[in-house]
Amino acid sequence: MTELIYKIIKPETEVRATLVCVHGMQEHHARYISFARELSKQGIAVLIYDLPGHGEAFKDELGYFADRNGDEVLIQSVDTMVKKLHAEYTHVPHFLFGHSMGSIIVRLYLERNDNFAGVILCGAPNYQPAAGFGQKLAQLLVKMKGPKAKTKLLTALSVGSFSKAVKNAKTPVDWLSYNEENVKQFLNDELCGVPFTDAGNRDLFTMVSHLHHPFTAKNPSLPILFISGEDDPCTGGTLGLVDSISTLQKNGYANIENITFPKMR
């Protein structure tokens, strides 16, 4: 079993809090080093890591998590890293951060463990009714072609609509950011933008379909902050954010805030 690559960025001063950072799809932990360093200046010890199927350790199997139940593999990775960081710093507040697909994983993880001082969900994708169909189609293709095959149709179903959301786009990933340098860095990184395998897309669709899964919050006063760009196609716009927030409220979370940044993706 491949060991997950992780790094803890520690403050030079006393640690005031911890944060586990869960990155998005088709990227890796090194893209969050500058973010972690900024937080460390505020006394926060930040653990960044590569999700299964992402980063240098998985460069020969990018976008593949497991033959079966890859969604569980992703969610379990959060638990592993949370326990690792919390064991090192036992007497400070603990926070959890998830970006894009990472925010999906974090939301599903809350059913198992919501014992945090706060959770930040960045660019959080909304529930998609068609995810159930995508999951069944992907599973059929896995049976036909194997878990590590890649089908363009599944890639189009999972992320194709994002690129279509940007008019006069110069690249297929302009939807990531208005900042052209950010887009260029993503395109020039061999560990970024590699399409998921059919099994990987199956697991992604499974997680999205589970976003509406009801559960009872153990920590209903948990502060949850949604942050996103106004033009981020992942969130589903205002209606998508409302749905994401109301879903958590239905599960018992009563302390949710949202910040939407204008003219940003």
Segments from the language model and where they lie:
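A short loop-to-beta-strand scaffold at the N-terminal edge of the catalytic core in hydrolase folds
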Residues: 1-10
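Alpha/beta-hydrolase-fold enzymes
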Residues: 106-191
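Conserved alpha/beta-hydrolase
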Residues: 29-62
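Alpha/beta-hydrolase fold nucleophile elbow
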Residues: 89-100
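Active-site glycine-rich loops that stabilize anionic/oxyanionic intermediates
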Residues: 23-27, 100, 230-231
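Alpha/beta-hydrolase active-site loop
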Residues: 67-86
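Short beta-strand element of the alpha/beta-hydrolase
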Residues: 15-24
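Short beta-strand/loop motif that positions the catalytic acidic residue
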Residues: 226-228
